[in-house]
Structures are given as C-alpha cells and as structure tokens.
A protein has these predicted regions:
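Intrinsically disordered, low-complexity
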Residues: 1-48, 98, 149-160
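A generic structural signal for residues embedded in beta-strands
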Residues: 107-108, 133
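Flexible, gly/ser-rich surface segments that form the specificity/activation loops bordering the active-site cleft
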Residues: 109-117
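Short, compositionally biased
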Residues: 3-10, 117-130
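Paired acidic/hydrophobic, glycine-rich loop segments that form the ligand-binding mouth/hinge
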Residues: 105-107, 124
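Catalytic Cys-His active-site segments of thiol-dependent hydrolases/isopeptidases
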Residues: 75-81, 122-145
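Catalytic cysteine-centered active-site loop
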Residues: 41-102, 113, 142, 149-153
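Short loop segments at secondary-structure junctions
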Residues: 111, 127-130, 160
Length: 160
C-alpha cells in the first residue's frame, strides 16, 4: 500500500449532521502515510505543554514525535520543534515544497527566538493541502489547510 493514505473525510448527510468516512489519498511513503493517518486520528485531542507525553494531550513537537514513534520511527524525540528540525536537517532528510507528500513535516519560523532557524511550530502534512497540528490550548489538535504563504522560512522534512 505504499503511496496510499486513508484519512477521515467529513461530509454532511441529509439530516445535516457530519459523517466521517475514509478517503484514500495518493502519495507518500508507507511510514509517512502511517504517521499522517495516526496524526488524523489525534484530531480533537487536547493541547498542553505540561502534559505533552500523557495520553490524549500534545504540544506541536510531541504530536510529531509520538505519531512517528507509533509509525516505527523513534529518533524524533526532541523537546522542541527546533530540535526535531535540526536533527532532520543534519541527517539530510529535508525536501522541497514541490516534493511534499503525506507524512512530511512542516516547520514554522515566525520571529527570532534563539532556537535552531528560529523554528517555533511544527505540523504533519496529510496531503490535499491539509495538515494536522497541535495548534494551541483553545483549539487542541486540529486539521487545517496548509498555506505555504504563511511560512517566512519554509523547511520541510521527510523522516526515514
């Protein structure tokens, strides 16, 4: 099944409520697809830096390393998104925007913060111009549109 990702896709039914059904998305590696699928399953979980390693709670970097750990890649255990980015860059795992596939990691730099490349946020690309990330305490883990124009210094990586 390399190159195929199953994700939940919302649609409204006749009664006006939302149905969630599986939709297949092409592209991505087997591990990347699995990490993306796991990330989608975390949508609705809470956001907390203090409880980032407890069941049902994530911050942005713990969402990435825990989804990838569940998919079989255990080296992404940095305390921050910047730590994860530095490891992936140093090990030659970056990709360009045109190469993005489900499971790839998107790193955000908003302002100078003294961390590696000023990275302060991270998300998992799930295909179809969408991503999953632990947004903040009020939103928790969410599925959002991916807008590359929001990135000041784009950095994308594909763990292997």
């Amino acid at each position: 099944l390399d190159g195929v990702l199953d994700v939940y896709e919302p649609s409204s039914n006749a009664a006006g409520s939302i149905d969630w059904s599986w939709k297949r998305i092409a592209g991505g590696s087997e591990v990347g697809n699995l990490a993306a699928q796991i990330a989608v399953s975390k949508v609705g979980c809470g956001y907390s830096q203090a409880m980032r390693d407890e069941e049902g709670w994530y911050d942005c970097s713990s969402l990435v390393y825990r989804c990838y750990a569940e998919a079989g890649i255990t080296y992404l255990n940095g305390k921050t998104a910047a730590d994860e980015a530095k490891y992936l860059v140093e090990h030659g795992m970056t990709v360009s925007a045109s190469e993005l596939q489900p499971g790839d990691i998107i790193f955000y730099s908003y302002e100078s913060n003294g961390r590696y490349r000023n990275i302060s946020h991270v998300a998992i690309y799930i295909g179809n111009d969408e991503m999953v990330h632990a947004a903040n305490p009020s939103r928790g883990v969410v599925r959002d549109p991916f807008r590359p124009s929001n990135l000041t210094e784009p950095l994308y990586a594909r763990p292997q």
